[in-house]
Regions:
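Loop-helix junctions at membrane interfaces
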Residues: 1-164
Length: 164
C-alpha cells in the first residue's frame, strides 16, 4: 500500500511539473520554433521520467492530460486534436518504458509518436475546414519536429535519471 501512495505522489508531482513547464510559454514569450523545440523537449523528458520513476503505465495519464492544457492555453486551435496528441503521448511513453533496455528500440518511440500525431492530425484536417496555412503549420508541427523533441526528451531524461 505504501508503494502505491509513493507512486501516486510521484505521478502527481510529475504532472504538476509538466503543467508548470507547459505554462512557460505564457510567461516567457518565445518564437514559435523555439517554443516548440524547447518546451516540447522538456515535456517529453518529464513524461519519460514519470514512467521510469513510477514504473507504471498509469503515468501515461500525464501524456493524456497535457494536450488539454495546451488547448486551454491556446496552443491547439482544434479541440479534436486533444485525443490525437494524447494518444501519441501515451503510446510514446508506453513504448519508451517497454523498450527502455534497448537503445535502438527506445529511440523508435519518437517515430511512433510522430507517426500517430502526423496521421491523426491529417485525418482531423480532412474533416475540419481550416485555412491552408493553419493546416500546413499543424501538419508540420506534428511531423519531424516530434521526432527531434522526442529524442532530445529521451536524452534529457537519461541524463536526469542517472543523477537521481
Amino acid at each position: 500500500m505504501q508503494d502505491r501512495w509513493k507512486a501516486s505522489v510521484r505521478l502527481a508531482s510529475f504532472l504538476a511539473l509538466a503543467l508548470v513547464l507547459q505554462s512557460i510559454r505564457l510567461v516567457v514569450p518565445l518564437p514559435g520554433p523555439v517554443n516548440m523545440f524547447f518546451i516540447g523537449s522538456l515535456l517529453n523528458a518529464v513524461m519519460i521520467l514519470s514512467i521510469w520513476q513510477t514504473r507504471s503505465y498509469r503515468a501515461c495519464i500525464i501524456g493524456l492530460i497535457l494536450p488539454m492544457g495546451a488547448f486551454l492555453q491556446g496552443q491547439l486551435p482544434l479541440v479534436f486534436l486533444i485525443p490525437v496528441i494524447g494518444l501519441g503521448n501515451a503510446c510514446f511513453m508506453a513504448w519508451v518504458y517497454r523498450f527502455r533496455r534497448s537503445r535502438a528500440a527506445l529511440f523508435a518511440g519518437p517515430l511512433v509518436k510522430a507517426g500517430i500525431l502526423y496521421g491523426g492530425t491529417n485525418i482531423v484536417l480532412a474533416i475540419v475546414a481550416l485555412p491552408d496555412v493553419v493546416g500546413q503549420t499543424l501538419s508540420f508541427m506534428m511531423s519531424w519536429p516530434q521526432i527531434v523533441t522526442g529524442c532530445v526528451g529521451i536524452v534529457l531524461a537519461g541524463i536526469v535519471w542517472r543523477r537521481l
